[in-house]
A protein has these predicted regions:
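Ferredoxin-type iron-sulfur electron-transfer modules and their immediate structural context
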Residues: 381, 456-461, 468-608, 627, ...
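N-terminal flexible segment immediately upstream of the FAD-binding catalytic core
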Residues: 1-54, 58, 68-100, 129, ...
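C-terminal substrate-binding/cap subdomain adjacent to the FAD-binding core in PCMH-type
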Residues: 139-141, 149-155, 159-366, 402, ...
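Terminal amphipathic helices with adjacent charged low-complexity linkers/tails
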Residues: 243-245, 268-271, 275-381, 385, ...
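Iron-sulfur cluster-binding electron-transfer modules in prokaryotic oxidoreductases
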Residues: 495, 502, 626-971
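Flexible, glycine/charged-enriched surface loops at secondary-structure junctions
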Residues: 15-19, 66, 125-128, 196-213, ...
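A glycine-rich phosphate-binding loop feature that marks nucleotide/adenosyl-phosphate handling sites
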Residues: 71-74, 130-137, 208-215, 219, ...
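N-terminal glycine-rich flavin-associated loop
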Residues: 8, 31-63, 81, 85-128, ...
Length: 971
């Protein structure tokens, strides 16, 4: 784009960016394709959208409308101006329950809309697997449908009216009640009527899902409704700014039948036999997808429910029923009757009936994560989306699957077959290594032959994902000249200058299925450094883990723990996907300065990553941004030298030791404004942040005095009188030097349980601060000393941790540093809360707690949640008689160790914290707040008037005399 073109677009007042960072972020979507745009616009309203699109058109710059960028076929990328509607255009308004309608900005996410509608007893019917990030604009543009198409149909059927932006900048509202674009409508009606016979020939009945062909078949039946033309047009006719939508009542009840099969073909045959039961959905998942759930915390409950480890199978049909009778009783009876009929059908190896909503949600969580689970496969060969959207009639599925296998088996290819069996649509993903010429040849061969196979069945090569780049070249053979020419004329009516998404749907030679592939396929990534970390969980390689990011956008959500900076800001660069893309861009030298380790783009991506580890659990492909970040920082510091600030933060344990030699002086200096101002200027530690205070007495010194004191009370178990045995209490930096009261509370609880406690002598810092700063050699040296120290002692003694980030260092990151015997030590490491809860589960009366009514709210540490289900914390708190506990639905607190202390990160840190703060402020004032992480407690104390406790304090305070506060009495 020339400077003159940029100026013309800038003058509209719209937020438009032409910088390299933004262009690289928007060069990809969830497909295998990559096209670098000239710029990206973020319109705040329809007027701005019209102005910027008009300016681009006048400047001769093509426009690609974009939502969340979850397209699997390249719909949302282009070489001109990307107009992104998901950042600002997220308003929901004009809810009319009587009419059953609502108006939404097209940037509204499906889950956001359904959360808004649920209290009113309504939902938006079409339910796509990407509901946590898919925008309504994208769903309309693709005519999405999802699993429950048998009862809800496609998105087009739920559109009442659309507010659209034309290529000349006009903003028009279209729909059957609106008179706008009357001339255009008449021209299109004339075109479509002439093609009626050809449509009947090309599209015989029975096909439940198919690419709409600009919806001309639907428009033929409703010629006064141009929304039928726009729904499914993939941003090639106009940009959609807002939509009035039909909404549906929530079902009164649901039930689910699971049928397990020995083969995919048997499951497809059974699908045909089950359709008479009128299910809301019949979804298929196969063994390649199910195998990818192994070892993943977020899917373990689902694996247990499905009994996958004890009763393996090749294929599962998920058959869901809705009950919508006039009364709840009748609705329940309707579901029960159909579940009984399903149970009686002689299909499958075994069946399982579910009516518990929580259990059904577990099953859906596996199905919805299908794409990312499959692409999380280890190695360069991945299940690739390119023939994934072809649909046939459900009765044709068995023969269609055999046809696909006859294409792939001679080529030696495996594939996964999962998806919407009730609608005749399987998301078939052949396993290919697109880095190599041989598999690229097979890629082309499979695509060509599948297109021919779909024609034989008179099916649809695309059903709900669109045409995009991947299928444009096949449209003429799929539709024929007459229908394609009708569509081309409709394109000219709306977009005579071919401004919107040019080259897609109508081939001009620029878009082939094997063109515009991501650069890491055509030019495999190479590292300019020797990796230090093992990437031990799965991939065993930096590049392997980086390439696990398929762009699906699972990190672009507002729930769970991934990705907290995206939740706070909505910026693409703040997401796991954005960061992975920028790392890849840096390695491909697509950054300013062409330095793969140091650039503005890389700093923007990595410096705001909190290393919360949320992506390691919630990204089904297990992208580990925390490891990727620290590996890159290490390579940079090894080349350029470790900066002073990173050196200081790497040595917090040493600073604690020094500060505790003169705590009064050290604490006084923390509030001395000139000193704090100097610290901010020299090393960037914010003068406005409180810093951890130093203890008057170190915990380890208190503990020595405690051991030397005579036994007081009945619960003290040192001096060789252990009832249960020996435990090592890991006194981390903050317990030792800053928060000894937490260690004292833990001692009281452990001794009340009858344990003999010791502290590790000559222990070093766990290495977490150094690891987080990319100072990996220092972290490894500390790790080796700690492992050697602990390995030299008794090999079965549990090591109990109070700080989750220290615990995660031992159980995960020591292995990443390739420390000998790290696995052995990791097996002995346990969080204090888990240790106590496990014991009380076996012996509920082991601790004499008082009985008093109280509310407890728990904010778990990110690292704990990335490894363990935090439900055990709620169980533990509720073991205290009279207590009612809840685990807060929160992500990272935003402090993230040193991150929140940095002057340039304070505002973002506080922004990230708002989810935690809002959750706490919504609680009754008397609620006790529990936070296991020292950073979490510090952040909450800084931003509120509340001072959270550690779980050890809650337990110690609840012990009945004489055991209560025994340790403190010996201080």
């Amino acid at each position: 784009m020339t400077p003159a073109q940029q100026r013309k677009i800038w003058q509209t007042g719209c937020d438009v960016r032409f910088d390299n960072l933004t262009r690289q972020l928007y060069a990809i979507d969830a497909s295998i394709y990559q096209i670098e745009p000239a710029g990206v616009a973020f319109p705040r309203n329809a007027h701005e959208a019209g102005a910027v699109i008009c300016a681009a058109a006048d400047a001769g710059v093509p426009v690609t409308p974009r939502g969340a960028g979850t397209s699997l076929v390249g719909n949302a990328i282009g070489e001109g101006l990307i107009v992104e509607f998901s950042r600002h255009n997220r308003q929901i308004h004009d809810l009319d329950l009587e009419k059953g309608s609502v108006r939404v900005g097209t940037g509204v996410v499906l889950d956001q809309l359904n959360a808004f509608l649920k209290p009113h007893g309504f939902c938006f019917g079409p339910d796509v697997a990407t509901s946590s990030r898919a925008t309504l604009g994208g769903m309309i543009a693709n005519n999405s449908s999802g699993a429950r198409c048998p009862i809800y149909g496609t998105t087009a059927g739920h559109v009442i009216s659309l507010e659209i932006v034309m290529a000349d900048g006009r903003v028009e509202t279209i729909g059957p009640r609106h008179e706008s674009l009357r001339a255009e409508r008449a021209r299109i009606e004339n075109l479509v009527r002439r093609a009626g016979a050809e449509m009947a020939e090309r599209w015989p009945p029975g096909l439940i899902k198919r690419w709409p062909g600009y919806g001309i078949e639907k428009f033929l039946r409703a010629p006064n409704d141009l929304t039928k033309i726009l729904a499914g047009s993939e941003g090639t006719l106009a940009a959609i700014f807002s939509a009035e939508l039909h909404i549906s009542p929530l079902p009164r009840c649901k039930g689910m039948g699971l049928i397990f099969f020995a083969s995919v073909t048997e499951a497809m045959q059974a699908t045909v036999e089950l359709l008479d039961l009128q299910p809301a959905a019949i979804e298929h998942v196969d063994r390649p997808l199910l195998d990818q759930t192994k070892g993943q915390l977020q899917f373990q409950a689902a694996r247990d429910l499905l009994e996958l480890d004890s009763k393996p199978c090749e294929s599962i049909l998920i058959v869901e029923f809705y009950g919508d009778g006039p009364t709840a009783t009748r609705a329940q009876s309707s579901v029960a009757e159909r579940l009984a009929l399903l149970q009686s059908r002689g299909v499958g190896l075994r069946k399982k009936i579910l009516t518990d909503p929580a259990q059904m949600d577990l099953v859906w969580s596996v199905r919805k994560s299908g794409l990312s689970l499959l692409t999380g496969r280890v190695g360069a060969s991945k299940p690739v989306a390119f023939i994934e959207d072809a649909a046939v009639r459900p009765a044709q599925l068995p023969e269609y699957v055999r046809g696909l296998r006859s294409i792939m088996e001679p080529l030696g290819l495996e594939a996964s077959y999962y998806g919407h069996a009730a609608s005749g649509l399987l998301h078939v993903r052949p396993v290919l290594d697109l880095h190599g010429a041989e598999d690229l040849r097979k890629f082309r061969q499979v695509a060509d032959q599948t297109s021919a196979l779909v024609r034989q069945f008179k099916g649809s090569l695309s059903a709900e994902h669109g045409v995009g780049i991947a299928r444009t070249e096949y449209l003429r053979e799929q539709l024929g000249d007459e229908l394609l020419d009708v569509l081309r004329e409709i394109k000219r009516v709306f977009d005579p200058r071919d401004i919107f998404n040019p080259g897609k749907i109508f081939s001009d030679g620029r878009h082939k299925i094997d063109s515009h592939l991501r650069e890491n396929f055509t030019r495999p990534l190479e590292l300019p450094f020797q990796p230090r970390l093992a990437f031990a969980f799965k991939d065993r390689s930096f590049i392997g883990n980086l390439e696990q990011c398929n762009g699906c956008g699972g990190c672009l959500k507002q729930s769970g723990i991934m990705c907290p900076t995206f939740m706070a800001t909505g910026g693409e660069v703040m997401s796991t996907r954005g960061r992975a893309n920028i790392i890849r861009a840096a390695l491909e030298l697509r950054v300013q300065g062409r330095d793969p380790l140091k650039s503005e783009e890389l700093d923007a991506a990595l410096s705001n990553c909190l290393s919360c580890k949320g992506c390691t659990q919630e990204c089904p492909s297990n992208v580990n941004l925390a490891l990727l970040k620290t590996e890159l920082l290490h390579a940079r510091w090894r080349r350029d030298g470790l900066p002073l600030r990173e050196r200081i933060f790497s040595n917090l344990d040493l600073l604690g030791k020094i500060g505790c030699t003169m705590p009064r002086l050290a604490n006084g200096s923390l509030n001395f404004r000139p000193l704090r101002a100097a610290m901010e200027k020299t090393v960037g530690i914010s003068a406005d942040r409180s810093l951890p205070r130093y203890a008057n007495e170190r915990f380890d010194r208190w503990f020595r005095r405690h051991l030397a004191a005579p036994t007081v009370g009945e619960g003290k178990a040192h001096c060789g009188a252990a009832i249960r045995g020996h435990v090592i209490l890991w006194d981390d930096t903050f317990v030792r030097y800053h928060e000894p009261h937490i260690g004292i509370a833990a001692v009281a609880v452990l001794e009340a349980l009858g344990f003999q406690i010791s502290l590790p002598k000559n222990r070093r810092c766990c290495g977490r601060p150094a690891f987080s700063q990319g100072n990996l050699d220092a972290a490894a040296a500390l790790a080796k000393q700690n492992v050697d120290l602990l390995a030299a002692g008794r090999p079965t003694v549990p090591i109990v941790f109070l700080e989750p980030s220290c615990w995660s260092m031992f159980v995960e990151d020591y292995r990443e540093l390739n420390i000998a015997r790290a696995d052995e030590i990791a097996g002995r490491c346990v969080l204090f809360e888990k240790f106590v809860d496990d014991l009380l589960a076996r012996e509920p009366g082991a601790l004499p707690f008082d009985n008093r009514p109280a509310r407890v709210a728990i904010h778990p540490h990110c690292h704990a949640k990335s490894i363990l289900d935090p439900a055990f914390m709620k169980r533990l708190a509720e073991r205290l008689p009279g207590r009612r506990a809840t685990v807060l639905d929160t992500a990272c607190c935003g402090m993230a160790g040193a991150f929140g202390m940095l002057a340039e990160k304070c505002d973002l840190s506080a922004q990230v914290a708002q989810r935690v703060i809002n959750a706490i402020r919504s609680l009754p004032s008397e609620t006790e707040i529990i936070a296991s992480g020292t950073s979490c407690r510090h952040q909450i104390s800084d931003l509120t008037t509340i001072h959270p406790k550690h779980m050890a304090e809650l337990l110690a305070d609840s012990l009945q005399p004489p055991t209560a506060k025994t340790a403190a009495q010996n201080a």
